């Protein structure tokens, strides 16, 4: 985390032996959703922000990644480990409460890259999902034997 005033020094938000990533700040700036593998698999957690040690709630069960807040602040979305987009109703006032998860849609194969590949429209009515077309026959691998000689032939050094 980097403060925008003062010396602008970068400091880790979490200092654990686990992997925490894909953090998303709630629209009101009070809550931080993120994924962590502290349970042995990636799950979705929410903490108060910036006082992250004042509480922690696990929203997903059975695996979760890539949390994204709805702009209205009353819904948190995440992706299961099998590629299903889930929705959790939340209250993000001075305290944090949440309900159960419900299925939104199954994401297309090829959209499950490591980064944030989806978002929700400001009105909450549509989703944008970045995906790639399935390729016939799989990926191609080209092996070049004696590659140094081939490089010298293509790029002669005089």
Name these PLM-found stretches:
Residues 1-14, 30-31, 35-58, 72-75, ...:
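Beta-propeller blade-edge and WD-like acidic-aromatic loop motif
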Residues 13, 17-35, 56-77, 110-126:
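Conserved beta-propeller blade repeats
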